């Protein structure tokens, strides 16, 4: 079993396993591949044969990173932009900057090359439809800036709107899927072929 990074850490990572025996995709099909769920403010990474899934995303954004050379994938469920407060002792991975540091570290622990990562972003919706609520925009701007500072490519995004989303990554195939609202799951990106199933989205 691989390890999943828990967010309420101090300096050292604490790990927990959240593997299930199966999961159901957006079409109701049953899959036997063990999966790991990243809840709000959590970061996870795993090698080939695992499926990484975000819990539902509102203004939060799922950072889906993948190293095609090692088939190691990682997912960070980011809640807030920027860096955590200086006095914060727990929940640091809720913040974009700290979550990315954790994501790249745990992926490297699984064998990934931090310089070889490809990124997709999913989420960042204004689900409450508040006119002056900008947290979803701030999250996207913060993550985009931090990722580009590392010279890592953002291959595909599915962000904005007002409906909740979910992200799912297959580490074996290098495919990432997204679900918006109650719609069926759709493939967003293939990390190996760079194919996009829905290029007009």
Curated annotation (Swiss-Prot):
Gene that this polypeptide is encoded by: cheD
EC number: 3.5.1.44
Gene3D superfamilies named in the record: 3.30.1330.200
Family recorded in the similarity comment: Belongs to the CheD family.
Enzyme class (EC, first level): hydrolase
Keyword Aminoacyl-tRNA synthetase recorded: no
Catalytic function, reaction form: L-glutaminyl-[protein] + H2O = L-glutamyl-[protein] + NH4(+)
Transmembrane residue ranges: none
Keywords (A to Z) from UniProt: Chemotaxis, Hydrolase
GO biological process, alphabetically ordered: chemotaxis
Keyword Hydrolase: yes
Protein name (record): Probable chemoreceptor glutamine deamidase CheD
Cross-referenced Pfam families: CheD
An annotated Gene Ontology molecular function: protein-glutamine glutaminase activity
Signal sequence coordinates: none
Function: Probably deamidates glutamine residues to glutamate on methyl-accepting chemotaxis receptors (MCPs), playing an important role in chemotaxis.
């Amino acid at each position: 079993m691989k390890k999943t990074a828990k967010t309420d850490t101090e300096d050292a990572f604490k790990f927990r396993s959240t593997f299930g025996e199966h999961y159901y995709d957006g079409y109701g099909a049953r899959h036997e591949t063990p999966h790991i769920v990243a809840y709000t403010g959590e970061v996870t990474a795993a090698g080939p044969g695992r499926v990484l899934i975000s819990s539902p995303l509102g203004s939060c954004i799922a950072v889906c990173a993948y190293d095609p050379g090692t088939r190691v994938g990682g997912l960070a469920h980011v809640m807030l932009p920027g860096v955590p407060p200086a006095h914060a002792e727990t929940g640091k991975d809720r913040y974009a900057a700290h979550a990315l540091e954790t994501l790249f570290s745990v992926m490297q622990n699984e064998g990934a090359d931090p310089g070889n990562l490809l990124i997709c972003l999913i989420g960042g919706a204004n689900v409450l439809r508040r006119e002056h609520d900008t947290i979803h925009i701030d999250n996207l701007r913060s993550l985009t800036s931090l990722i580009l500072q590392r010279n890592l490519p953002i291959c595909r995004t599915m962000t904005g709107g007002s409906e909740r989303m979910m992200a799912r990554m297959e580490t074996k195939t290098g495919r990432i899927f997204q679900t918006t609202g109650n719609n069926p799951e759709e493939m967003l990106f293939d990390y190996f072929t760079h194919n996009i199933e829905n290029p007009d989205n």
